[in-house]
């Protein structure tokens, strides 16, 4: 009932002020879909899972592992073309390109999703430039074009759109999303591609040069708000954290503590706030210390399980950011499925970078402020 009241109030505010809202649907993660089909173990072995590769590329060719979106679970609708063609996308603050499958992609991966047909759009213009996003075992190949992109009540008549003609592997066959809409800085975008939010800012289509994200714990009422901060989604005050590198939404974490003792990120570390990842990644050595402290044990998928009966006695994990504490309770950093509880912390052997995904964002309403290059955090309702 509370979610319904909040949603109705938000919609009323949107209509009154011209604020743009995109409802986010919480769906099944690709990890869970693969596990249900008995495909996860083989997939992880073949992909040589390294989430850090999502965060190590600049230049003309984007490079992202297929596993980047293995844990994405919040999706929204956009429309491309005239008349509009509908797509479900991950609104991803960890990348900058917009791409969807096209009718020229004939693989089962594409056939299982909505595919854009440029021939049916009177406003489509082929840019004549290739798009290549490299994954662990192949490439998403395609091309760039211009077309009208509609996001809620915002209509951008001249947005660059990537259209895939080839997608690697069968893994995306089971995803609930069609494509990706990146919300990171333009320095991460492929050559000739302009990020959607940058276009909106340049054309003054948003009231303010910022956007905010609320992720409901139960998946109902989750919202991406463009051009505004909505106090109805958080309690207390927003606290601001400066962006340290204008590529991702990257900032400094002072330390990670348990029971007042620093167990990870000792002396400070860099972290990224990423809506395209549901879990919380960190260097394997640091994450292992956290797993040991919370009593988690590794399973055959490389995940860490905890005893569901121990949640009440497990410790709170606290992130200190810009001098303030952001605690994560056991109920926040674990997920329960079919009687098993899994830790929301995962390690990466190839990076010192921390990635604060939905595990963190569900607890803290997040504002991404491009005008001032900062992130705002407040306790979510």
From Swiss-Prot:
Keyword tags: Aspartyl protease, Digestion, Disulfide bond, Glycoprotein, Hydrolase, Protease, Signal, Zymogen
Disulfide-bond pairs as recorded: 105-110, 265-269, 308-341
Signal peptide span: 1-16
Species of the source: Camelus dromedarius (Dromedary)
Entry protein name: Chymosin
Temperature dependence: Optimum temperature is between 45-55 degrees Celsius. 50% activity at 35 and 60 degrees Celsius. No activity below 20 or above 70 degrees Celsius.
EC number: 3.4.23.4
Domain Peptidase A1: 74-378
PANTHER family: BETA-SITE APP-CLEAVING ENZYME, ISOFORM A-RELATED, CHYMOSIN
Domain of life, source organism: Eukaryota
């Amino acid at each position: 009932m509370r979610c319904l009241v909040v949603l109705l109030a938000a919609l009323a505010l949107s209509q009154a002020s011209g604020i743009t809202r995109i409802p986010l649907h919480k769906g099944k993660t690709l990890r869970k879909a693969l596990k249900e089909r008995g495909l996860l173990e083989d997939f992880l072995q073949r992909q040589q899972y390294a989430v850090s590769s999502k965060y190590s590329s600049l230049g003309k060719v984007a490079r992202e592992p297929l596993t980047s979106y293995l844990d994405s679970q919040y999706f929204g609708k956009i429309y491309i073309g005239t008349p509009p063609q509908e797509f479900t996308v991950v609104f991803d603050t960890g990348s900058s390109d917009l791409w969807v499958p096209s009718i020229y992609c004939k693989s089962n991966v594409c056939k299982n999703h909505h595919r854009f047909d440029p021939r049916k759009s009177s406003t489509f213009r082929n840019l004549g430039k290739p798009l290549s996003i490299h994954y662990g075992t192949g490439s998403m190949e395609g091309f760039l074009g211009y077309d009208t992109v509609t996001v809620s009540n915002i209509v951008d008549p001249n947005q660059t759109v990537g259209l895939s003609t080839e997608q690697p592997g069968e893994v995306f066959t089971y995803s609930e999303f069609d494509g990706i809409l990146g919300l990171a800085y333009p320095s991460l975008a492929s050559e000739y591609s302009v990020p959607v939010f940058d276009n909106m800012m340049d054309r003054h289509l948003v009231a303010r040069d910022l956007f905010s994200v609320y992720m409901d714990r139960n998946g109902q009422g989750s919202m991406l708000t463009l051009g505004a901060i909505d106090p109805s989604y958080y309690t207390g005050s927003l606290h601001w954290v400066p962006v340290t590198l204008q590529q991702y939404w990257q900032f400094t974490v002072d330390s990670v503590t348990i029971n007042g003792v620093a167990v990870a990120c000792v002396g400070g570390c860099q972290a990224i706030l990423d809506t395209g990842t549901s879990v919380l990644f960190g260097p394997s050595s640091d994450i292992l210390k956290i797993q040991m402290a919370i009593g988690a044990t590794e399973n055959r998928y490389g995940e860490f399980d905890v005893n569901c009966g121990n949640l009440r006695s497990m410790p709170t994990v606290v992130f200190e950011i810009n001098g303030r504490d952001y605690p994560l309770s056991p109920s926040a950093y674990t997920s329960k499925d079919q009687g098993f509880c899994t830790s929301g912390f995962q390690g990466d052997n190839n990076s010192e970078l921390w990635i604060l995904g939905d595990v963190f964002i569900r607890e803290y309403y997040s504002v991404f402020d491009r005008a001032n290059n900062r992130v705002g955090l407040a306790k979510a309702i």
